[in-house]
Amino acid sequence: MAQERSGIAVGLNKGHKTTPLNTPKTRISRSKGKASRRTAFVRDIAREVVGLAPYERRVIELLRNAQDKRARKLAKKRLGTFTRGKRKVEDMQRVIAEARRVGAH
């Protein structure tokens, strides 16, 4: 929180004396797009049951062959925007790492 003003015209703490606002929680409107724990859990279960989409399998194959740029281009083409494609490629890299971890044990 901001420090209370001193009432003096100069210095780091200059300005009229004010009472600081105490806003406890963030607005609900700011939390849009954040997945709840329940939603994340349900999506995780669905991913386990259903598996990967064909384009996701192809992205993984490209990543395994060290063709990151091609994988990003494919994901961008399938998903529409560069940012979504980038996020999907990161997600697929996480899937590969998890598979390696499971395979090692």
From Swiss-Prot:
The keyword Transport does not apply. GO terms for molecular function: structural constituent of ribosome. Component of the large ribosomal subunit (LSU). GO terms for cellular component: cytosolic large ribosomal subunit. PROSITE patterns: RIBOSOMAL_L36E. It is found in: Cytoplasm. The keyword Ribosomal protein applies. Residues 1-36 are annotated as: Disordered. Residues 27-36 have a biased composition (Basic residues). One of its GO terms (biological process) is cytoplasmic translation. Belongs to the eukaryotic ribosomal protein eL36 family. This is Large ribosomal subunit protein eL36. Component of the ribosome, a large ribonucleoprotein complex responsible for the synthesis of proteins in the cell. The small ribosomal subunit (SSU) binds messenger RNAs (mRNAs) and translates the encoded message by selecting cognate aminoacyl-transfer RNA (tRNA) molecules. The large subunit (LSU) contains the ribosomal catalytic site termed the peptidyl transferase center (PTC), which catalyzes the formation of peptide bonds, thereby polymerizing the amino acids delivered by tRNAs into a polypeptide chain.
